[in-house]
């Protein structure tokens, strides 16, 4: 996350940290005791290690809950997958992961509400994650960083992205003058509007946070029926 501050230690109980065996990370969001949602491009053929209740990933407190992925589902629901072919398309950059055992709800491990209505253009929303804070260099913080950005009309991203795939199932968000953005390592994390999971960090330009460059987020409300069918 660029241009933000360390998240409040108790202010992200739904935020999951996803680890691949080779070390790269994504974020995810706890939906209920058994499932998290993340970006499809975070797909990994092997087991993903999932930390919940994590704040400082280098200094664990002992009340974190660690699970591994038992099953991964990409959109559409028929893609309960063995290979990553159905998960690699950014057009529907959303993936559900079933945990190997249920989490216990605590002060630091709780789900985030799904959206009840679309976020309005101009709304201020919060994006968070453990991604790099120093583009074009890559420096990953020990703690999640939060920043507030603005919901923009998708046409803004279409102009900035010049024929990139801006569909009705994505959202455009950022700041006109740059300086605040999600970035490398934040993929799969939440864009939160009015206390609800409005978007999932999907993609954007690099270096991040450039003026007239914006982040693209999976529009969660477009996949609500699918998510609720698990």
From Swiss-Prot:
Cystine bridges: 7-146, 26-42, 125-193, 157-172, 183-208
InterPro entries for the chain: Peptidase_S1_PA, Peptidase_S1_PA_chymotrypsin, Peptidase_S1A, Serine_Proteases_S1, Trypsin_dom, TRYPSIN_HIS, TRYPSIN_SER
UniProt xrefs under CDD domains: Tryp_SPc
Enzyme class label: hydrolase
Listed PROSITE patterns: TRYPSIN_DOM (PS50240), TRYPSIN_HIS (PS00134), TRYPSIN_SER (PS00135)
Chain segments annotated as transmembrane: none
Entry EC number(s): 3.4.21.-
Cell compartment(s), UniProt: Secreted
Domain of life assignment: Eukaryota
Glycosylation sites: 84
SUPFAM superfamilies linked to this entry: Trypsin-like serine proteases
UniProt family annotation: Belongs to the peptidase S1 family.
Name of the molecule in the record: Gilatoxin
């Amino acid at each position: 996350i660029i241009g933000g501050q360390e998240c409040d230690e108790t202010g992200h109980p739904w935020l999951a940290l996803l680890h691949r065996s080779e070390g790269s990370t994504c974020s995810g969001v706890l939906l209920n005791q058994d499932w998290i949602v993340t970006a499809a491009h975070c797909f990994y053929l092997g087991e993903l290690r999932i930390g919940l209740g994590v704040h400082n990933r280098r200094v664990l407190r002992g009340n974190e809950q660690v699970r591994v992925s038992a099953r991964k589902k990409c959109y559409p629901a028929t893609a309960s997958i063995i290979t990553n072919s159905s998960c690699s398309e950014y057009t529907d950059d959303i993936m559900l992961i079933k945990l190997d055992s249920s989490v216990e709800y605590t002060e630091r491990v709780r789900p985030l509400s799904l959206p009840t209505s679309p976020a309005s253009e101009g709304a201020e929303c919060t994006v968070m994650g453990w991604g790099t804070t120093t583009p074009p260099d890559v420096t990953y913080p020990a703690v999640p960083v939060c920043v507030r950005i603005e919901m923009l009309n998708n046409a803004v991203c279409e102009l900035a992205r010049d024929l990139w795939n801006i569909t009705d199932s994505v959202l455009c968000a950022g700041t006109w003058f740059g300086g605040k953005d999600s970035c490398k390592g934040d993929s799969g994390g939440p864009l939160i509007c009015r206390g609800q999971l409005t978007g999932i960090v999907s993609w954007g330009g690099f270096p991040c946070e450039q003026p007239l460059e914006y982040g693209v987020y999976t529009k969660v409300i477009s996949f609500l029926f699918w998510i609720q069918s698990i």
